[in-house]
Amino acid sequence: MSNKMWGGRFTDRPDAIMEEINVSIDVDRHLYAQDIAASKAHAAMLAAQGIITANDAKNIGKGLDTILSEIGAGKFTFKRALEDIHMNVESRLAELIGPAAGRLHTARSRNDQVATDFRLYVRDVLDETDAALASFQRALVERALEHAETVMPGFTHLQTAQPVTFGHHLMAYVEMAARDRGRFQDARKRLNESPLGAAALAGTSFPIDRHATAKKLGFDRPMANSLDAVSDRDFVLETLSAASICAVHLSRFAEEIVIWTSPLVGLVRLSDKFTTGSSIMPQKRNPDAAELVRAKTGRVIGALNGLLIVMKGLPLAYQKDMQEDKQGAMEGFAALSLAIRAMTGMVRDIVPEQDRMRAAAGEGYATATDLADWLVRTLKMPFRDAHHVTGKIVGLAAKAGVALHELPLKEMQAVEPKISRDALAVLSVESSVKSRTSYGGTAPKNVRAQAKAWLKRLEKEQKLG
């Protein structure tokens, strides 16, 4: 005869393999705080509705508080034989308060219980991630203000394209992080409905108040359909999708740091705080933190793909497949959290090699577009013609092995006789970046204005809490 809480109709004990594949406590133990909070709200509602006595609800609440303290202090023994966090808590509650513990599960199933727990858990993840990204943004903005005039090469195809400022480059990631935060905030809005009280799938015949438990747990409202409440994990998928996009942004920045710190490039330097050495090569300083951020992106994307595959073929309502929704997601969330904190640390630590940046910004004829723009503005030349003329001049400079501003004026005039000495003034990298004053451009005054606006915005967010 089975000794499981669900074992009334079973005559044989589960096979050892069945026990092993069915157990989830190693993963869902991380939901203990959410499980206890939901159970306390449920018990209070049951008492308010006259379904259980006020005394039983009081004892249940005290017992749950004791369990919360025990787990927090590391004094709670999780038992694999009890399968999951729900039964581990309920079993210990019975030890503490006796038969009244059995009343807690009235008008509730593990199906709506775990859906509620996991929504609460993911909601906490969303709030923590938003706060971490705000710190990341602040670090970027502060460094951008510091380097609003630090000239560096801008790239396309990993080839020198046009001069930009280091501050402008950093502010690009502020904007990406803002969209990431927006996606997380949007996901939170859709997540914030309570499944509690949906029971197994069809609701319950008890006169429960789902609005009361939803309010108690900080949800906006109860979910409107009991089948939907226990069947879907789209709130996890949406959060993992936003997390994957965020991780890709971090990975791109990490990739740049890896490239820039290479001695062959040498645009930036990381301190010993964010580098490691080699066990055989004494000279090495490896950008391992950036490399690991890049790698952890795979963990986040993998978690999304894994859960999509779990969910894709499941008919309504709950299926045991959905027990596999947590481990990958939790690992993905943890990987993203660590990546954000690591990138925040590297942003604060990174030192731009300003002389090298300035020199690199002038390589590859990066101010060629400025010459083409001068031809358009001064000679009223159509841009396509100006592009063609400038291309020929770049070809002459490349053939002579000189920078664009080093090419003699007479050789430029051999291509276009109307070019005057005034054109040479636009060929410096400083002139180039200062001229990019269009909204969103790299001009230092733009970068400062944007960064200051972001600082005010972040400070306002912090005050509002």
From Swiss-Prot:
GO terms under biological process: arginine biosynthetic process via ornithine; L-arginine biosynthetic process
SUPFAM superfamilies named among the record's database cross-references: L-aspartase-like (SSF48557)
Gene Ontology terms: cellular component: cytosol
Reactions performed catalytically: 2-(N(omega)-L-arginino)succinate = fumarate + L-arginine
InterPro entries to which the protein is assigned, alphabetical: Arg_succ_lyase_C, Argininosuccinate_lyase, Fumarase/histidase_N, Fumarate_lyase_CS, Fumarate_lyase_fam, Fumarate_lyase_N, L-Aspartase-like
Enzyme class: lyase
Subcellular location field: Cytoplasm
Pathway: Amino-acid biosynthesis; L-arginine biosynthesis; L-arginine from L-ornithine and carbamoyl phosphate: step 3/3
Record key words, sorted: Amino-acid biosynthesis, Arginine biosynthesis, Cytoplasm, Lyase
Protein origin, superkingdom: Bacteria
EC number: 4.3.2.1
Pfam family, one: Lyase_1
GO molecular function: argininosuccinate lyase activity
NCBIfam families to which the protein is assigned, alphabetical: argH
Family: Belongs to the lyase 1 family. Argininosuccinate lyase subfamily.
Protein name per UniProt: Argininosuccinate lyase
Source organism: Rhodopseudomonas palustris (strain BisB5)
Gene label: argH
